[in-house]
Amino acid sequence: MAVLEAAPEYRGEGRFAAEPALAKRAFGRIYAGWALSQDFYRAGLHLSPETPDLAAYLRVWETRYDTKPAADLLAQLRCWDAGDISDNPLHGGDLPRALAAIRARVLLMPGATDLYFRVADNEAELPHLRDAKLLPIPSIHGHRAGNPAGNATDTAFLREAVRLWLG
């Protein structure tokens, strides 16, 4: 959020006087380091004929958000940041109590290498859920684990896990 809010075009309250092109490029470059895991980069999966080196790969990420309105990106980030199911009068900030109130069966499937939603977070939540299973996606694709676009291995894992879960 900070890179968008630091843009000279930012006017506060989620509004921009104009699209902050440089801030969105920085946003994309920063996100490249968080969207995918260190293992992804070590394995060289970022390399292709179109991106023969890290600099070329990062240039692709720098332009990834060119067509996305900065206000939309900021709103999405703020929703994610505020996403606390216990932050309400019913649960009073008590996350274990809020989790225990969930009656649906829950299949927790974080990416094994996700830098945002870590397996450890779900491990801490699991004991508070009534009927849940933790099944990390064994992927080096970080936050993008399970994204079926161009990832047949993750797709197959997800399909089988959901098939077994639904019985």
Report residues per predicted region.
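Active-site nucleophile elbow and catalytic-triad environment of alpha/beta-hydrolase enzymes
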Residues: 57, 75-98
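Alpha-helix capping/termination and helix-coil
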Residues: 35, 65, 77-84, 106
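Long, compositionally biased charged/polar accessory segments in the mid-to-C-terminal portions
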Residues: 69-71, 75
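Catalytic active-site module of serine/aspartate enzymes centered on a nucleophile-bearing elbow/loop
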Residues: 123-167
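Short, conserved loop/helix-junction motifs that constitute active-site signature segments
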Residues: 99-103, 127-130
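Conserved alpha/beta-hydrolase "acid-adjacent" motif
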Residues: 91, 115-121
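Alpha/beta-hydrolase-fold enzymes
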Residues: 1-63
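Short beta-strand/loop motif that positions the catalytic acidic residue
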Residues: 102, 108-110
